[in-house]
């Protein structure tokens, strides 16, 4: 069960990733976690990555692919794995394919931009406790105030509307082309491709994924 998740930030991939990991007993592979682990372990690729990062440069696709290949060969990936946030670009997807990393299912979580903006820009947090509210879905009893302490609520920088829209623009420019890439792969029989309406209730999406991936 080798899965790639696609979808804009705020489309609900993280929630479903947790569900899929628990259901199928597969690990989630994050390139950031992999880089940190490889550097800590002092592996050859880790040392190369550290040198690049220490010089303030971006880690190359070749290095990342090497790390992914190393990671998916580990024991806990025997039953499969879940890739979220990678590949991000067509060259990365091509390089993955060329290096023999097989993908069984590509799941695209489709949510309109305006819904994502509402979801994320509507969040308010109480910095002292970490309590999270939402102007639409879970509003505080008193506008702008924490229910328990009465302190002012704030907006996380990542949830500012301008930031959300900027991240969405980057997603559409860089990652959206992967939809075409993997749909073409599915047509050729290399993998299955499933588009999921991410505006549905979490439980409904859980059921849909269980049925489709059974």
From Swiss-Prot:
User: From the Swiss-Prot or TrEMBL record, what is one GO molecular function term?
Assistant: adenylate kinase activity
Write out the annotated subcellular location: Cytoplasm
As recorded in UniProt, its EC number(s) are: 2.7.4.3
Locate the region LID.
Answer: 122-159
Q: Name one GO cellular component term.
A: cytoplasm
Q: Which principal EC class is assigned to this enzyme? A: transferase
Binding residues annotated for ATP, in chain numbering: 10-15, 123, 132-133, 200
Q: Which UniProt keywords apply?
A: ATP-binding, Cytoplasm, Kinase, Nucleotide biosynthesis, Nucleotide-binding, Transferase
Segments for region (NMP):
30-59
Q: Which residues bind AMP?
A: 31, 36, 57-59, 85-88, 92, 156, 167
GO BP, sorted A to Z: AMP salvage
User: Where is it chiefly localized?
Assistant: cytoplasm
Q: Reaction catalysed?
A: AMP + ATP = 2 ADP
Q: How does it assemble?
A: Monomer.
Q: Which family, according to the similarity comment?
A: Belongs to the adenylate kinase family.
PANTHER family the record matches: NUCLEOTIDE KINASE
The identity of this protein, by name, is Adenylate kinase
Instruction: Provide the species name.
Output: Colwellia psychrerythraea (strain 34H / ATCC BAA-681) (Vibrio psychroerythus)
Q: Gene encoding this polypeptide?
A: adk
């Amino acid at each position: 069960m080798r899965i790639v998740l696609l979808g804009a930030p705020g489309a609900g991939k993280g929630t479903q990733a947790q569900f899929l990991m628990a259901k199928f007993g597969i690990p989630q592979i994050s390139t950031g976690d992999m880089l940190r682990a490889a550097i800590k372990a002092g592996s050859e690729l880790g040392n190369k990555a550290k040198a690049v990062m220490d010089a303030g440069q971006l880690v190359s696709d070749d290095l990342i692919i090497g790390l992914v290949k190393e990671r998916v060969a580990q024991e806990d990936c025997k039953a499969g794995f879940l890739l979220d946030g990678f590949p991000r670009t067509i060259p990365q997807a091509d390089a993955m394919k060329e290096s023999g990393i097989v993908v069984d299912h590509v799941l695209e979580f489709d949510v309109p931009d305006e819904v994502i903006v509402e979801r994320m820009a509507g969040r308010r947090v109480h910095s002292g406790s970490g309590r999270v509210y939402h102007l639409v879905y879970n509003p505080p009893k008193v506008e702008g105030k924490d229910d328990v302490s009465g302190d002012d609520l704030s907006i996380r920088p990542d949830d500012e509307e301008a930031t959300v829209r900027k991240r969405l623009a980057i997603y559409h420019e860089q990652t959206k082309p992967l939809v075409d890439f993997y749909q073409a792969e599915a047509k050729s029989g290399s993998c299955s491709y499933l588009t999921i309406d991410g505006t549905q209730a979490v439980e409904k999406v859980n059921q849909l994924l269980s049925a489709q991936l059974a």
